Each structure stands twice: as structure tokens, then as C-alpha cells.
Amino acid sequence: MTDEQSMVEEFHKKFDILVQASPTAASEETKRLRIRLIQEEFDELKESMAEGNLAALAKEMADLLYVVYGTAVSYGIDMDPVFREVHRSNLSKVGGYKREDGKWVKPPTYSPADIEPLLAMQMSASEEAQRPLGGVEEMLRGA
């Protein structure tokens, strides 16, 4: 987990905001809250861009990242490996070309981000951490 996501998780814990230990579907209430928070911060980001104040822009970018990381915390998703996989996928776009509208067209060598295995690993690691100790670990813990 990145330092940034860890800080947001700390905030969630201090303010009794939902924290999931592993990837978990969110309730409708949580979904609505996260969408509203992201939209609010995105709107504030657009306003700061229109104003041209770099300090305000930097603050609003941080606020948007904060609520996006908060969404990851609420869903129990460690974003570090997810971001790395998306980065790997994005770099596989080398060899494509940019259209007139600025969109990058993917080359045949493009490889889409494969997120499912990452979430499965996160769920498995969480389940492993929750298993009761046995054998040597249990004896050492009792010592």
C-alpha cells in the first residue's frame, strides 16, 4: 500500500469511516457517498483550473486523490499493485499513434491491465492473515 493510501486509511479509522481489509463490494449507501465525494472534489478541481491559481489547483488535486484513495480503502483495494499494472498496460501502448482529438490509439502490441488476479491475491492474503495460528506459530505465541 502506498504511503498516501495508508494516510487516508489512518484518516478513515480516526473518523470511523468504512475500512475494508480486503477487496469487498460496497453497499449502495457507500457507493453513493463515494460518487458524491469524488464529484464534489472533481468540480472543485475544475474551478481551480479555470481560476489559474496553481496553489489552489495543487490542493484540489490532492483532495481528489484523497477521496479516490478513500474509495479504495472503503472497497478494501490496495491500489499500489493495481496502479503498477495499469502503468505497465499504458506503457504497452508504445508504437501507437495520437489522433487529432488527442486520444492515443493502441498498437497491436497493447496488453490490457489484468486486475482480477491482483484482487484475488489481495483477498487470499487477507484470508490467510485471518486464519488461526497453529503448530509452531501457536507455541511461539504462547511463549
Task: Report the location of each language-model feature.
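Flexible "arm" and connector segments at domain edges
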Residues: 1-61, 65-143
